[in-house]
Amino acid sequence: MAMTAAQKAEIVKGFQRAEGDTGSSEVQIALLTARINDLTPHFKANTKDHHSRRGLLKLVSRRRRLLDYLKRTDAEGYRALITRLGLRK
């Protein structure tokens, strides 16, 4: 199911660096992680849905690129974020 505006606002509030920050790498990664986690159960039930799986893989690769950027620019923030989100390195 799609993420509601309230859920999105809650995620932004939890990961923003300053008031009104919606575009920092941390916020974008957290939002992508929430979307990925929402889509994952769909593929357990619908194993042949390859069209949507491609969209999921695009989200995962976008998150990976943002994580690589964050690791390059702010290594300590990267480590803190992956532990908060429960991601592997």
Curated annotation (Swiss-Prot):
Membrane-traversing stretches: none
Keyword Lyase: no
SS bond list: none
SMART domains: Ribosomal_S15
Residue ranges the record marks as coiled coil: none
CDD domains, alphabetized: Ribosomal_S15p_S13e
UniProt keyword rRNA-binding present: yes
GO CC entries: cytosolic small ribosomal subunit
GO biological process, one term: translation
Signal peptide: none
Keywords per UniProt: Ribonucleoprotein, Ribosomal protein, RNA-binding, rRNA-binding
Alphabetical list of Pfam families matching this protein: Ribosomal_S15 (PF00312)
PANTHER family on file: RIBOSOMAL PROTEIN S15, BACTERIAL AND ORGANELLAR (PTHR23321), SMALL RIBOSOMAL SUBUNIT PROTEIN US15M (PTHR23321:SF26)
Subunit text: Part of the 30S ribosomal subunit. Forms a bridge to the 50S subunit in the 70S ribosome, contacting the 23S rRNA.
NCBIfam families for this protein: S15_bact
Role description: One of the primary rRNA binding proteins, it binds directly to 16S rRNA where it helps nucleate assembly of the platform of the 30S subunit by binding and bridging several RNA helices of the 16S rRNA. Forms an intersubunit bridge (bridge B4) with the 23S rRNA of the 50S subunit in the ribosome.
Family designation: Belongs to the universal ribosomal protein uS15 family.
Name used for this protein in its record: Small ribosomal subunit protein uS15
Organism of provenance: Chromobacterium violaceum (strain ATCC 12472 / DSM 30191 / JCM 1249 / CCUG 213 / NBRC 12614 / NCIMB 9131 / NCTC 9757 / MK)
